[in-house]
Amino acid sequence: MVSITEQTAILAKYLDLSQNGKVLAEYVWIDADGNSRSKCKTLDKKPSSVEDLPEWNFDGSSTGQAPGHDSDVYLRPVAFYADPFRKGDNIIVLTECWNNDGTPNKFNHRHESAKLMKAHADEEVWFGLEQEYTLFDQFDQPYAWPKGGFPAPQGPYYCGVGTGKVYARDLIEAHYRACLHAGVDISGINAEVMPSQWEFQVGPCEGIQMGDELWIARYLLQRVAEEFGVKVSFHPKPLKGEWNGAGCHTNVSTKSMRLPGGMKSIEVALSKLAKRHKEHMLLYGADNDQRLTGRHETASIEGFSSGVANRGASVRIPRSVAKEGYGYFEDRRPASNIDPYLVTGIMVETICGSIPDADMFKEYARESSD
């Protein structure tokens, strides 16, 4: 049997072949389970803008996005990035899913979120997302954990250095470079509290770009992990017991929050978030109740709380922000498996105001509609 490393080496010589002027465009979309899917299309030339990219389609009955008797779902390009795998002029295309009647597919939450971002563009809302995830081997065991046993308790792994303290750094470094090559605004990485758990940060990004960049960063992570024979889990509590869960802490600021005296705007935003806690929690990721227990650096899912430098609160205000009197806040409630369009959308809706033609709670509920 050929090893994964050998397969990659074999592939390399074919990637050096001429494409005779053609460009490969990998179309990426989000399926019914919140996973990324993709397929490739040949273009005659490199596009200069997203408007140059053709609409495409796929079999939605095979992804849980359409019934078999009416299975065509259409892919509308919304952004494209340099392809770090094929390199050259090849690209990765992020798309929205649309039904054949011209309506957004019920798992396309970008469309609704974009309405809110556009309506509140003057607020200049910035986001930064901290994506945590856990690595597993091909047999669904935590990557590099002792066979049939457990590693030492949590403590030495967070931002750890050295054998036995960090695992799969090569994969993480490869993903970091892939994001930078693609043009994703990745701002950092670190090993997390549980062994074989990592985090990358994307942002700050303004408006709808935040969701776009996180989805592409996730896609790139899954693709890189393929080459290492490693599985990536975004489950918020992949292992029961005395192990940290995985979140997607959401850092938020508006223009007024970033100006001197902005703490007043932050306090107003927190009071609005407190009033919609239950609604937000429904959009903050499946199985999040397993993570938000009030332990392992989380708040309880049952109520809203906030505090300065408090990682056991629903929302944390960094100490530097409290000292300077302006900046941003960190919503620690979102789970690692969120749809960032839902989370950033309801955040803007809550702190900036609702608009007549967009409702993120109803948008989320569309997933359960017939």
Swiss-Prot record:
Q: Which InterPro entries match?
A: Gln_synt_N, Gln_synt_N_sf, Gln_synth/guanido_kin_cat_dom, Gln_synth_cat_dom, Gln_synth_gly_rich_site, Gln_synth_N_conserv_site, Glutamine_Synthetase
Region called Disordered, residue ranges: 40-69
- Domain annotation GS beta-grasp: ranges: 23-102
Catalysis: reaction(s)? L-glutamate + NH4(+) + ATP = L-glutamine + ADP + phosphate + H(+)
Which compartment or compartments is the protein found in? Cytoplasm
Listed under GO cellular component are: cytoplasm
Q: Which domain of life is it from?
A: Eukaryota
The residue ranges of the GS catalytic domain are 109-370
Indicate yes or no for the key word Secreted: no
**Biological process (GO), any one:** glutamine biosynthetic process
EC category:
ligase
- What Enzyme Commission number(s) apply to this enzyme? 6.3.1.2
Q: Name one GO molecular function term.
A: ATP binding
**Name of a matching Pfam family:** Gln-synt_C
| Keyword terms of this UniProt record | ATP-binding, Cytoplasm, Ligase, Nucleotide-binding
| Entry-linked PANTHER family | GLUTAMINE SYNTHETASE, GLUTAMINE SYNTHETASE 2 CYTOPLASMIC
Family to which the UniProt record says this protein belongs? Belongs to the glutamine synthetase family.
Q: How does it assemble?
A: Homooctamer.
Q: What is this protein's record name?
A: Glutamine synthetase
Q: Which gene encodes it?
A: GLN1
